């Protein structure tokens, strides 16, 4: 089933890519209307939107999905339910495609809910307590976005149709459209895990690694960014854009800090995804939708490769994800290490790799844009933190001696997994320049002073040095000492967001509920209610029973008494 799915998806991806080129070069947009029901004067029509953006994004989703399924053939080889896993992944891709090509909020909701439901099934795929908790957190966080989307559908009743794309430009200054835009922004923030909904993204790492490669690169988390790209007119012309810029900037800063304190391999990569999502959202809130789309596509390539390499390492390490137990992997797994380092360098923005073209352009656009000092600081500091945790990860996993058990057989003989990774490796090297020429056919002239041009390079070098220094033992133990304990706990736990969004949200309602139960249900209500009445009746019946047993005279007297009462009632 893996091979059939791979061939079908890769051929569909190629078709979508060629179509997107045709649409882009000829500046074409197609609306396809499909009439579902026609009854007298009423008709229900489903509309699909095909333009270069939707087709290109769809081709990337299909390509990454095909390589992930091909990779899963070996990664999930020993799993008894691999066919169920492949079916869930295909359902995931189908939901994503429905969301991409829909200009209608109702059909978007179908794809949106499909993503939420299937992602829950995939997160709890390994059935244990940790997976169930992570799945519940994921489902409930995304449910807030579903409610926001339903409310926006209700608001759109004012327009008589749910095809939002027809009304965005004309109605952009109206209160109703502003309300719809704010609700859609809330939905996108939950799906793309922006502050204060960030805690579910690292928790979702309980899913199998191929799912992480698909979900955290090109599908679930980017659905929110893609939706806001479609609603960009409202963001860029109202206060919503300023709010989004602040929240997304704080998200990428928080995720970058958290990744420097994390030791779980998959969680570090998940936090790097969160940081890049914040970068996409922030540049989108400034009105540069093509640039956000460009970074979304390049990020999908190297992040999927990074997760695949992490999966191969975990597979060889007997399911151990602690980076402190790794070391010297470049000797034992040279091909996987090469792919891992290329994807890490692309994430840092190494010149002429996929991430460089989008990240460098974003930072230069920020430098010439009218943003305040706080946002400017967040952009550049977050870039430095990205390089820092990437170099820290390379230091822990690739250098030094192997720290795991001596019985671990580390090798690079997983040829099916390696082939899947090689396809993405090529795209991670050439994808950035290829997309740059496609999306921006005429180069931008960005004229900046030399110190502003070199600021990005300087921040990256400082970040790399900091990542190396933070890994050294003396700094590490100082950081974990009681002197720095509170600060490192705060920064390493995503500013306590997982605790606030789980324990913090339910603590007071549960305590109040317990008080109500103790005071009423198990207190005076219990005394004056059923239990007290039951006890009294039991006591009286026992007393009467004893009286009947002990005295024949009383028994006969009561018998006569009840006969008299019955006769009186009978003749009244």
From Swiss-Prot:
Key words of the record: Electron transport, Membrane, Mitochondrion, Mitochondrion inner membrane, NAD, Respiratory chain, Translocase, Transmembrane, Transmembrane helix, Transport, Ubiquinone
GO molecular function: NADH dehydrogenase (ubiquinone) activity
Its job: Core subunit of the mitochondrial membrane respiratory chain NADH dehydrogenase (Complex I) that is believed to belong to the minimal assembly required for catalysis. Complex I functions in the transfer of electrons from NADH to the respiratory chain. The immediate electron acceptor for the enzyme is believed to be ubiquinone.
Record carries keyword Transmembrane helix: yes
Membrane spanning residue stretches: 4-24, 44-64, 86-106, 107-127, 147-167, 170-190, 217-237, 239-259, 268-288, 294-314, 337-357, 372-394, 422-442, 457-477, 490-510, 552-572
Catalysis performed (reactions): a ubiquinone + NADH + 5 H(+)(in) = a ubiquinol + NAD(+) + 4 H(+)(out)
Leader peptide range in chain numbering: none
Intrachain S-S bonds: none
Organism: Drosophila melanogaster (Fruit fly)
Membrane-topology annotation of the record: Multi-pass membrane protein
Stated name of the protein: NADH-ubiquinone oxidoreductase chain 5
Record Pfam families: NADH5_C (PF06455), Proton_antipo_M (PF00361), Proton_antipo_N (PF00662)
Annotated PANTHER family: NADH-UBIQUINONE OXIDOREDUCTASE CHAIN 5
Places the protein is found: Mitochondrion inner membrane
Enzyme Commission number: 7.1.1.2
GO terms of biological process kind: electron transport coupled proton transport; mitochondrial electron transport, NADH to ubiquinone
GO cellular component, one term: mitochondrial inner membrane
Membership in a protein family: Belongs to the complex I subunit 5 family.
Alphabetical list of InterPro entries matching this protein: NADH_DH_su5_C, ND/Mrp_TM, NU5C-like, Proton_antipo_N
